[in-house]
Amino acid sequence: KIERLSKRGGGTVVVPAGKWYSGRIELKSNVELRLDEGAVIEFSGEVDDYQPAVFTRHEGVEVMGAGAFIYANGAKNIALTGKGVIMGPPMDVPMRKFPNGKSVVENDIDYRMPVKERLCDGKEGRTFYRPKSFSPINCKNVLVEGVTFERSLLWNVNPVYCENVIIRGVTVNSTDVPSGDGIDISSCKNVLIEYSTLNCGDDCFTLKAGRCEDGLRVNRPTENVLIRYCLA
């Protein structure tokens, strides 16, 4: 439905009150995903629901992996809004026990390998990096407003290579999640974060610009970020 709506010029997909179960959702240009009050989207804890691998960035290194519960690549004018909840799978799902790589990411990935060959999809014994909750990459004009993120598998809100991002009035609850960062901005430009409440067991806010040799290769800083009126 999202792709069809985008091809028609855009619009709003409304998730009504109730509990909904989903694998990865991909936002497309000119589409708003709005969660009504009382709507809960619980995302899958199965590796197969995050296939095929998509272009993403894990801990500052470009890979092909799970991406995020809600993902976008190369989209413009996208929004995730409303008073509903984005929720990860139950705390006892096997995916939560997967090692998030064999070691730190720079020891897992051969930087000489083309990015399209850096496959981290959890298949055939390959590394699996758990999906973030919301991670648009290479997007322009991104709005995240009002929603609550709970029980993440990894970082919650992680724009990458994005321009003109507004994150307003969101709530993050991830105190029991290892590496359950709140809002991580990675190589983005023109970002406003305001009126948000973050309760995290790891970093509440981070500003990133790539890691080690891969970060130097990409050479994209994070710039012009304003964080104000938040509780963390």
Where are these regions (language model features)?
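Extracellular/periplasmic carbohydrate-active domains that bind, remodel
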Residues: 1-232
